[in-house]
Regions:
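Bacterial Sec-dependent N-terminal signal peptides
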Residues: 1-29
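Short S/T/G/P-rich N-terminal loop/turn motif that feeds into the first structured element of a domain
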Residues: 21-110, 115-116, 120-234, 244-263
C-alpha cells in the first residue's frame, strides 16, 4: 500500500505542478497539507494508532524538519461505530511531501518504534480504512497558524469544515469568495483562530475546500458563529448575486487534539 501511495504522490505532483505552476510562482509561500483520516472500530486499534503516532510518526516527521503536526480525534468517537482520528501535516511543496513520506520509511528509529503498526497482520489491521486528502493553502492564508488558546486540550473544539460545490467553475467562485470576496478576513476579524484555509486538490469529495477553526470550548464556538451570521459584512457578502448557490454540501466535524499533538 505504501508503494501505491508513493506512486500516487508522484503522479499527483506532476499533475498538480502543471495545474498550479502559475499560481505557485505568484504565491511561492503557499503550503500544501496532507490530511490523513484513520477509521477504526475499537480500543485495541486506537491504542496501536496512538502509540504509532506518538512514538514513531511524529518523531520521524520532526527529524525531517516538519515542526508542527496535528493529531486529533473526533469528539463523536465515544458514541460512533466508525471512529476517526486525523493527522494533519504541512509541507512547503508537493515534492517535499513525497520525499518526506519516502524518507521516513528508511528511518530505523521510526521502523523500530512503529513496528506493531507497520508490521500488523492482515487479519489484525490497526485501522479499518485510511483516507488521504491533499490540500493547497489559500492565497490569503498561505501558511498554517497555531491556535492561540489557553484551555486544556480536552476542552478545546477544533472545527473541520468541508464545502462541496456542484462543479469546478462554481467551486472556483466559492474559493474567490473566501479570498478576494473577503470571507477569510472576516473570520480573522472575528477571531476564529483558524489553523488553515485550503482547496482540496486530491480527495474523495471534490470539488471542495476545507478549513479548520479552533475554540476554547463548545460554548465559545457557538458564540463565535452567532456573531458571524449576524455580522453586517457577512450579511452583505452572502447576499451578493455572484455568490449564490456556490456550496452544495457541507460536512462539519468536531475534533479535539491528542495530548501529544503539536497543537
Amino acid at each position: 500500500m505504501k508503494r501505491k501511495y508513493f506512486v500516487l504522490l508522484a503522479l499527483l505532483g506532476a499533475v498538480a505542478f502543471a495545474a498550479n505552476d502559475a499560481h505557485a510562482q505568484k504565491n511561492p509561500d503557499r503550503e500544501y497539507y496532507e490530511l490523513k483520516i484513520y477509521h477504526f472500530k475499537d480500543s485495541a486499534q486506537e491504542k496501536i494508532l496512538n502509540t504509532y503516532f506518538q512514538f514513531a510518526l511524529l518523531p520521524a516527521l520532526h527529524r525531517q524538519k516538519i515542526e508542527y503536526i496535528g493529531v486529533f480525534k473526533a469528539i463523536a468517537n465515544d458514541t460512533a461505530a466508525d471512529k476517526l482520528m486525523y493527522v494533519f501535516t504541512p509541507f512547503k511543496s508537493l515534492k517535499e511531501m513525497q520525499q518526506v513520506n519516502k524518507d521516513i520509511m528508511y528511518d530505523k528509529a521510526y521502523n523500530a518504534a512503529g513496528s506493531v503498526y507497520l508490521d500488523a497482520a492482515y487479519n489484525k489491521p490497526p485501522y479499518t480504512r485510511m483516507e488521504v486528502i491533499i490540500l493547497y493553502a489559500f492565497p490569503l492564508a498561505p501558511k498554517m497558524q497555531l491556535p492561540q488558546l489557553r484551555s486544556a486540550a480536552n476542552e478545546r473544539v477544533y472545527e473541520l469544515r468541508s464545502y462541496e460545490s456542484a462543479t469546478e467553475k462554481i467551486f472556483a467562485n466559492k474559493v474567490q469568495m473566501f479570498n478576494e470576496g473577503g470571507e477569510v478576513p472576516l473570520f480573522k476579524r472575528l477571531n476564529f483562530n483558524a489553523v488553515f484555509y485550503s482547496e482540496v486538490i486530491a480527495g474523495a469529495h471534490m470539488p471542495n475546500l476545507m478549513y479548520m477553526t479552533t475554540f476554547e470550548n463548545m460554548q465559545e464556538r457557538e458564540a463565535h458563529w452567532k456573531t458571524f451570521v449576524e455580522d453586517a459584512e457577512w450579511k452583505k457578502l452572502s447576499s451578493m448575486p455572484e455568490y449564490q448557490n456556490n456550496v452544495q454540501h457541507i460536512d462539519i466535524t468536531f475534533l479535539r487534539p491528542l495530548l501529544y499533538s503539536d497543537f
